[in-house]
Amino acid sequence: MADYDVIVIGGGHAGCEAAAASARLGARTLLITHKKDTIGVMSCNPAIGGLGKGHLVREIDALDGLMGRVADAAGIQFRLLNRRKGPAVRGPRTQADRKLYREAMQREIASIENLDVAEGDAFDLQTEDGVVCGAVMKDGRSFRAASVVLTTGTFLRGLIHIGDRKMPAGRVGEQPSVGLSETLARFGLQLGRLKTGTPARLDGRTIDWGRVGRQGPDENPVPFSFMTDAIVNRQIDCGVTRTTDATHKIIADNIHRSAMYSGQIEGVGPRYCPSIEDKIVRFGERDGHQIFLEPEGLDDDTVYPNGISTSLPEDVQDAFIRTIPGLEQVTILQPGYAIEYDHVDPRELEPSLGVRRMPGLFLAGQINGTTGYEEAGAQGLVAGLNAALRAAERAPFFFSRTDSYIGVMIDDLTSRGIAEPYRMFTSRAEYRLSLRADNADMRLTPVGIELGCVGNARLTRFQQWKSAYEAGRTLLQSLSVTPNEGKRFGLKLNQDGQRRTAFEILSYPDQSIEGLRPLWPELQAIATDVAAALEIDAAYAVYMERQAADIIGVQREESTAIPEAFDYESLPGLSNELKQKLAQQKPRNLSQAMKVDGVTPAAISLILSWLRREDRRSKRVGG
């Protein structure tokens, strides 16, 4: 008998969500981490959410994951980004107190049934007949399980760079994981090298706050979690300053000393989170680059200068930072650095995040080529759920790009692979009008209930809210008015004699349930939060109807399965190049096949014709 059903290696954002999701499904789960004290550490910026990323956090929360609740417990500056734009692209974000975040995550992990935590260095995986079945520790211990989830972050052969200095590390002060990299290479998985970076940490007591701008929190904080009633932490401002011509000159004069530009780093960095060296080289004509001075905690004087990630030597960092307004006398507590690490080509994965050629092994987070806490957490949840499903001999669950940003991300990764660290944006989702942050619970909590990963507290609250929403929508659709009747109450409707329901009227600009209450006093019964959801759904109703046909088409493509043993070589009409690419990537369905580089509509037609012919043949044989 196995020691556990699921083993999760790594206690970062992906690992915590994976372990929690697995345990919520009832799997006996072991979380292996170097040190229990580092569970939930925010390795880079002290913030959760943002554009696209905030959607992922809401989706994690809708499935009863941890990140939203923990962010609410630790948030010290909540802001809803893109507030003036449509609800589809608004992004909830908070700066977080690092200490509060880590403590809240550790409390969550400690409170979960079926979840044990072990300290140590997992350096190898156990296999039997090509199936992963456990983990081997550096100290000689071993643990067996039906499924293993790797969430190693930047630890796989991690190498820190500060100028020409190199230090093997997963992050500052922690040893890298070398053994697991060798294990994955031994399995024949295609590995690559990526890079990310972080800025220096500053002593806030030595910043001249009078010389920098201020950015405050929203007056009414919007929580991440459906389960959060109110934000209780004191909310704070962050500072805003800019680089100067003097800053740019120092960096340009020393660019050859940067680890990135000296040829020392082979890994590719994130395009959308460039280092200050990249900004100067690529956007040298700008008169300055904005920097946000983000306090790392309510009782912590450390400040994170968001916008000046660097791998320059310490003396250059010290010089250029002091040319920035407000930072002339600043004390640097820790230099900025770049870190290189190994990752696996995500095209090696099934949409379950299971490794195709190594059954029993699942990967989540930066090991799959992504960047960001939110992307990692979302993958961890998916890998943890599917690892537990496999252990219970249940079918895997695949998220679709038509139902979630999680599905968009996983489809992008497993179908297209990556050329640089992958970051989520709302622009990546074709159906973003449907996949809003505000409706994540309505979209995904029913999925979580069906899977069995939603706890009783959320289940009860969700059912109550859904009942209130449905009652409110039924009421709005039962009330109607003619243009002339509406005119008496100040409603500007088309004078076409058509009756319109209250729900239809809400699709008009500047209409609200509050504004309709003089006409229909019974609308007082609709609670404020339910009214806000109904108003958004009414505004998007026409567009959602148009989008529905497109979604059905994509779902049809996703449901047209391609057998794993499909013989592309025997398919006439396909070029040799396409045969090789398709045979290598093994798309599971037509939707994935369409995303393979170079695949044409004609090639899809050939595959579809073959599938239909085989289907008819099997029916004849079966008949």
Curated annotation (Swiss-Prot):
GO terms for biological process: tRNA methylation; tRNA wobble uridine modification. Its cofactor is FAD. InterPro entries: FAD/NAD-bd_sf, GIDA_C_N, MnmG, MnmG-rel, MnmG-rel_CS, MnmG_C, MnmG_C_subdom, MnmG_C_subdom_sf. GO terms for molecular function: flavin adenine dinucleotide binding. Its main location: cytoplasm. Pfam families: GIDA (PF01134), GIDA_C_1st (PF21680), SAM_GIDA_C (PF13932). Belongs to the MnmG family. The gene is mnmG. This is tRNA uridine 5-carboxymethylaminomethyl modification enzyme MnmG. NAD-binding protein involved in the addition of a carboxymethylaminomethyl (cmnm) group at the wobble position (U34) of certain tRNAs, forming tRNA-cmnm(5)s(2)U34. Keywords: Cytoplasm, FAD, Flavoprotein, NAD, tRNA processing.
